[in-house]
Amino acid sequence: MSPETRKHAGILIVIIPTVIYGGVSILNFLINDPAYMQNPLRQNLFRAGHAHAGVLLILSLVVLLYVDEANLSNGWKSVIKNFIPAAAIFLPAAFFFSVLKPDATKPNGFINLAYVGVALLVTGLLTLGIGLIRRKTN
């Protein structure tokens, strides 16, 4: 693993406790906030946001195991190292920020951040996949 990739991994590992904090926050809503239980849309989007944050953060770490093996320029490797973790921010942000009001009955405009996150994720994954396929065995 290159020093730059190792640094990215360290940053991502340091960020993982924020997802843990998010889970504790949702648990707190479930236990102490009766209004939270009255809004299934908010419950579902908060749950989706938390799940996407955790899964995409772990995926970002897994990807770092492969990125240095890809037959790509350093610029494209940077795209992978940055786009996939960025998706772990944009997708959950879309879910959380779109229903911040406890009485929300539909997602607000922030839900469109999900499309940005999806575009970043797909770009990063396709780039890595193509780079790995292009790699010739030694």
Question: Which residue ranges define each predicted feature?
Answer:
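Polytopic transmembrane helical bundles with strong interfacial aromatic enrichment
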Residues: 1-36, 40-50, 54-138
